[in-house]
Amino acid sequence: MSRKLIILALFILIVIIVAAVTVFMLPQNGSVQPKAVIVDNLALMREASSNKDFVENATKILNEVGMEVDHFYLEEVTVNLYKNLGSYLIVILRVHSGMLGDDTYLFTSENIQKIGKYSQYLGKNKNYLGNACISTTGECFIAVGPSFIRDFSENFHDSVIIAMGCESLKTTALAEAFIAKGASVFIGWTREVTPEGTDNATLQLLRRFFIENKTVSKAVKDLVDKSTGAKLDFYPDKAENLKPFSLIEKLIVAKASFSIFLINQPLIFNESQFEINLSYRRLFRKF
């Protein structure tokens, strides 16, 4: 084999080693970025404020711990959106919800008259979608149930799900669906809630999580909607000692470490390349 081919082989070997180490260094839950999302359609109830203050205050709390925040509002809250939330670490569902039969369903902002375009989810013995109505306005919307989340949602990666709507944790079916898809904890209400009550309690929850660094069980303690008597609770029980702030720290540290690794690679490669070039010149001079 000629010396030129040997040198070329060495370069290829270096590239392979760098690529292999790069893959090894990627975080195991690399599909998740330190991002949060607020899915927001409480304003479907006309007397309910869109509560710009809630979104601004929640975003500020999350930004201060290094998280980017996306906000999907009213008409952006579709059936398909519920399928595509797996990339978020913190998922705040500021949406209407309620019981259909024995299960909690989450409202979309799509009028029930549009149900035809989701025919693939309809049929006998299919409980993927429901007809959910707001009693004060009489308007009805498409809602997604636990089986929809379980069968069609993206996988989550230890995500924290905060369901702000009514009866979101009256039974555990919806929570179980999110956990089955990879969420670490589901937080929701045991009864009906008011917009003001859920906004205030959720902001307090976020402060306890990301400013006071409390565990799930301590963060939800005594958080109630005084107007209805609803309590904020969590599922599963084994998540009681989870600290959501720690999840963010792990992702940020992993992302920073990986960035430093990538930055250093050109230096390592250039040094190796320089040494090989010297070897090539020495070999060349022998002829």
Each PLM stretch: what is its role?
Residues 2, 75-81, 141-145:
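A diffuse structural propensity rather than consistent per-protein peaks
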Residues 25-31, 151-154, 287:
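Short boundary motifs at domain starts and secondary-structure transition points
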Residues 1-30, 91, 178:
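Secretory targeting signatures
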Residues 27-125:
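A domain-level signal for caspase-like cysteine endopeptidase catalytic cores
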Residues 159-287:
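Active-site-proximal C-terminal subdomain of hydrolase catalytic domains
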Residues 100-186:
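Cysteine protease catalytic core and zymogen-processing segment of caspase-like enzymes
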Residues 15, 43-44, 168:
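Short, glycine-/Ser/Thr-/acidic-enriched flexible segments
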Residues 46-54, 83, 140-144, 153, ...:
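Extracytoplasmic/periplasmic, Sec-exported soluble proteins
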